[in-house]
Amino acid sequence: MHDEITLMLDTTGAGLHKRGYRAVGVVAPLRETLAAAMVLLSRYRGKDPFCDPFCGSGTIAIEAALIAKNRAPGLDRSFSAQKWGFVPASAWMEAADEAMDKEFDGDYDIWGGDIDPKAVSIARSNAEKAGVEDLVRFEVDRKSVV
């Protein structure tokens, strides 16, 4: 015997890809974490225009807005560890306050378009749930992109 034990605790609960703003999606929704990674790989930080011509439920454009604002992922969700008694609620509040203090205010040129009016309606609703409805412009766009 080696007298070893491994103790693992789930501090998070639901995965971080569940940001909480996408109650409704469309066919082939993109996970929020993957959308955020795509935006970060594009090196978008809010200074240049951002365009998603096939926006679907708006996940990529919404993540672009959250990144431009420097919004902490998961700020609007709860974590399993918050129910543990040995971490005071004030510690969670302080962490949230610190994250909010690091957010940027600004005007960003973020646009999402889709041929499907229902998808655009869902994208607008998701942007509102994410708190970025004033930062992202969604339009039904039937123009050919070819």
Model feature map: region roles:
Residues 12, 17, 26, 71, ...:
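Glycine-rich, flexible loop/turn motifs
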Residues 20-30:
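Class I SAM-dependent methyltransferase Rossmann-like catalytic core
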